[in-house]
Amino acid sequence: MAPTPELSPETLARHLAVLGPASGYCVAYSGGLDSTVLLHLMAALSAARELPLRAVHIHHGLQPQADAWAEHCRQQAAALGVDCLVLPVEVRRDSGEGLEAAARQARYAALASHLQSGEALLTAHHADDQAETVLLHLLRGSGPRGLAGMRAQRPLGRGRLLRPLLPWPRERLRAYGDTHALCWVEDPSNAHVAHDRNWLRHTLWPVLTQRWPDASRRVGRAAGEQAEAEALLRELAGEDLARHPPGPGLAVSVLARLSPARARNLVRHWLLMSGLRPPPRARLEQGLADLIRAGRDRQPVLTWPEGELRRYRDRIHRLPAGGPPPWPGPDREWDLRVPLVVPGVGVLRLVRADEGIAPSLIGAEGLSVGRRRRGERCQLAHDPGHRPLSKRFQEAGIPPWERDRVPILRRGEEVVAIANLGTAKRFTARPGYRLICEEHGPDGG
């Protein structure tokens, strides 16, 4: 392996160029050694190349020294000629994921919300951090995605998250800090070996580096191989997804033709595409097999803390944990003039059509939108007579858990239209408007 270059503003600039351009840079500045070194390097780059630069310090309020750390960051950034914004965040202690994970979630949410368009957020993760991450994932039994460790870049908010210090080990950062007489704070919680990462850092890592001094580079190289394998699996999942017939969710008939490993790979990446973290391997293996083997008249459910998979007929649907939100409250008045947002359901709008809702209804009084009512019936444009809405939903293949969320447009007590299904005969004109609902949900298409 080629030796790691010296850590300097020039080498950092070359590495940033590989990661791509940005409209400006924002350093996530905790006040510790790593982010202090990064801010010092970026301040030198900013002065030499007139790069827009600012810093953000997240005030978690979890340590007695939190206020002092925030003031330290303001002063150190000011000494470098960099504006530093202090953002207080509230860390949920009842999240069920542990205090460290909750703090990380709150931190990134705050950083993402304050990132400007095209701006790059820089974090100071280095090669030793990457090695620790990979080893922790290995001990948790993770697959290629976890063993790939932290990505050098990813989308975040309106910009990107960059980790430009990943090529350099911790010792290089400390040497840089000592050489430039930098001042940083020490978080006492980093010494608590009750945390897995701290135990690995203070207990196991010194033993590994005594035997293999370049252990972080070796683990980093392995992470790169795993990242490539994960990219290939993602590409394969994309090809398998493209073979699915149109419609929401995944087709059971297509999944059943794949090997179990390939089917799990497709489902895993399909969930990640929607922002849902997949279930653990054993849960996914058994649950997906049950979903595929179930008869068409069955409605099995695979649940895990982050979401659900449900089967209806030949499709598997992804849903948030606990299922979709119910219809929000009573009927809503709507005069059809502008789109209507129904929280948790979607956006209702009219689109021109050869046949549909009569234009004379736009702006009319007495119009409202709500969910179906018990025993409700209607006659759509080409029906011979009135039929129950429940029967229509079943024929349209609408899953049972969605039927109470289908928007129904009424005038008084009469059904005018059913979103995405049709217009009542009595209110139909040529030309007219179709009532459509563009869904918000994770399985909106």
Curated annotation (Swiss-Prot):
The keyword Chaperone does not apply. Keywords: ATP-binding, Cytoplasm, Ligase, Nucleotide-binding, tRNA processing. One of its GO terms (biological process) is tRNA modification. GO terms for molecular function: ATP binding; tRNA(Ile)-lysidine synthase activity. Pfam families: ATP_bind_3 (PF01171), TilS (PF09179), TilS_C (PF11734). The keyword tRNA processing applies. Its EC number is 6.3.4.19. It catalyses: cytidine(34) in tRNA(Ile2) + L-lysine + ATP = lysidine(34) in tRNA(Ile2) + AMP + diphosphate + H(+). It is found in: Cytoplasm. InterPro entries: Lysidine-tRNA-synth_C (IPR012796), Rossmann-like_a/b/a_fold (IPR014729), TilS/TtcA_N (IPR011063), tRNA_Ile_lys_synt (IPR012094), tRNA_Ile_lys_synt_N (IPR012795), tRNA_Ile_lys_synt_subst-bd (IPR015262). SMART domains: TilS_C. Signal peptide: none annotated. GO terms for cellular component: cytoplasm. ATP binds at S30, G31, G32, L33, D34, S35. HAMAP family: tRNA_Ile_lys_synt. Belongs to the tRNA(Ile)-lysidine synthase family. The N-terminal region contains the highly conserved SGGXDS motif, predicted to be a P-loop motif involved in ATP binding. Ligates lysine onto the cytidine present at position 34 of the AUA codon-specific tRNA(Ile) that contains the anticodon CAU, in an ATP-dependent manner. Cytidine is converted to lysidine, thus changing the amino acid specificity of the tRNA from methionine to isoleucine. This is tRNA(Ile)-lysidine synthase. It comes from Alkalilimnicola ehrlichii (strain ATCC BAA-1101 / DSM 17681 / MLHE-1).
